[in-house]
Amino acid sequence: MLFRMKDEKAHQLEAELDKLQADGPAAWAKLPEEELFTPAGFSEERAEATSYSNYSYWGSTFRAFFKNRVAVLLLVALIAVVAFAFLQPCLPGQADPNLCAVDPATGIQYRNIAPGEKGFIWGSNAIGQDLWARIWAGARTSLTIAFFVALIEAVVGITVGVLWGYVRQLDFFFTELYNICDNVPSTIILILISYVASPSVQTLILGMSITGWIAMARFIRNQILIIRDRDYNVTSRCIGTPTSRIVVRNLLPYLVSVIMLRMALTIPAAIGSEVFITYIGLGLSVEVPSLGNLINDGRKVMMQAGLRYQLLYPTIILSFVTIAFYLIGNAFSDAADPKNHLQ
């Protein structure tokens, strides 16, 4: 019944249309104005305005990141700690981290002075050195090592990873190189380099970087394989776009979030490696203040209740920097994901 009514209505409309066409333009003029078609107006300015998108990748990334209040607070605190660590020697009234302070009246060293007494903000160690100055100097040393290691690993790892994943002819070579390097524990290599070479900041940076890039390269390679043969990359190759331009314009922007996350995780990992290698006595010499040396010194007196501050303060700095970099890296990685820009 319903289909029959629709057919009758359709036939009626067709009949009216045929009649109007037969009568000519005069019949159209008799129709009410609201039944006539009204042509849409065209404005070139409005067309341009509606076709333009004001989307900005980095703008959307930072907007998404700043919505995470915990990450923002951690970022502000981390910037303050890192900035103070490097600016602390320039401030007035700061002690030499390697100076063994003595009592001018007796000539005896200020040994194991409690925090807040006799001008020692965080106390002194067993030979009268100011822990406030030594902890910030140790933070500078550890952060410097971590930043350089992260930078070297990023540059080498990204370069090798892109070549490994995009250039098919190099896949076999880099795969075998990865298998060789990955089968040797990085801790063993770090210990051997620290044992053979003289202990220094440069030695630790070299030892951590010589194998650290492997994980970054493999990670980038796997990501490149996912997007290498997508339509826009195949089209770019077909029209003769240089490989370097495809990598810079098509591949690397897609990997910004994961690269930032890997770099953010490399920094606390490098600090942890420095602490470990120094803790076992193969890292920096005891004259060089570092978080590893300070924690090792604090470990020796941790069983004495009145001296546990020597382990507590460097451990707090180490824990905060490590956790902050990890959480901020994860938050920025989530914010850099374009899927989160639509929320």
Language-model-detected regions and their locations in the chain:
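Alpha-helical transmembrane segments
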Residues: W213, A217, A270, V321-F325
